[in-house]
Amino acid sequence: HDASTFGIFGGVMPQHRDPLPPGVADLVISSAVVPSACTQWDVEEITVLGVQHHAHLVGKRLKVEVTRDGEYIGEMRREKVYDFNHQSSEESSVKKLKRGDELTLTCSYDTSSKTTPTNFGDFTQDEMCLAYFL
């Protein structure tokens, strides 16, 4: 049996995304869409064991959804209350990804306590939006 990991990066560095504006309690960004052309694996399907979300301090909610041939399949994982200090990998609700599936990563942010824009970047005070799969 083979095993591997892959990720969706919906905003990691400043050149990937505009800064998040300050003072917004629920800022939703459909951060990354992996089109079906990018999931043309050598096999018909892969089994996903787990999904791990990652954001920084103003990240509040994250989810990964699957669409197959234009039909919504479901959420692989939804994190309703993201906490930077308690990150974990969780079992995927969608167990099988098929060749050609489209994946969408959506991240929500709360910048209501900020007075200046929040940049994307590596530092904890910056922000990110990504998901890893096993």
Language-model regions, residue ranges each:
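Beta-strand-centric surfaces of beta-sandwich/beta-rich domains
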Residues: 1-134
